[in-house]
């Protein structure tokens, strides 16, 4: 039977998992075990859901760690002077390398609602870093329209931010 798993459903599932894993009253653990070879077709074997298989899994664990906090993340896109950003479009699937959100130097995250254009209608580079935490969309002097999304706290940055990824809210 075919199933449609939409991006919205995937996000809902991830949100539920994050909520469960961040619930300190019911701790979650992650385990690492030995690797086992699969068949030559690189297809994972179907679990048998037996007590024997569960025991074999537990015996192959090499370490476990209690999860203390988790966060969803997205690729980190630092706002850079002279970069062309694209306005968010809910009709587009998969943005590829087109950036439509930015992280500023004070860890505020903004979404680009409309890219700046010149008189000929060509996209122009962003030259004014968005700032402020008002929830209303605003236009910067370079013609870009931005909307503030959230700010990443220092604690969240230390825990979840890397050079490649940043936490979401």
Q: Where are the model-predicted features located?
A:
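Tryptophan-rich substrate-binding surfaces of secreted polymer-degrading and adhesive proteins
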Residues: 1-169
């Amino acid at each position: 039977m075919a199933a449609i798993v939409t991006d919205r459903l995937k996000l809902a599932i991830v949100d539920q998992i994050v909520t469960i894993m961040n619930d300190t009253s019911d701790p979650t653990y992650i385990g690492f075990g030995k690797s086992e070879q699969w068949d030559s077709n690189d297809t994972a074997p179907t679990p048998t859901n037996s007590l024997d298989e569960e025991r074999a899994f537990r015996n192959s664990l090499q370490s476990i760690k209690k999860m203390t906090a988790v966060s969803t993340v997205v690729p980190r896109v630092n706002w850079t002077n002279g970069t062309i950003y694209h306005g968010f479009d809910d009709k587009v699937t998969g943005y590829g390398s087109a950036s439509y959100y930015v992280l500023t130097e004070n860890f505020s995250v903004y979404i680009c609602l409309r890219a700046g254009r010149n008189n000929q209608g060509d996209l122009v580079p962003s030259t004014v870093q968005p700032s402020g935490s008002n929830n209303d969309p605003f236009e910067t002097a370079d013609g870009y329209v931005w909307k503030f999304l959230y700010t990443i706290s220092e604690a969240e940055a230390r825990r979840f931010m890397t050079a490649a990824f940043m936490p979401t809210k």
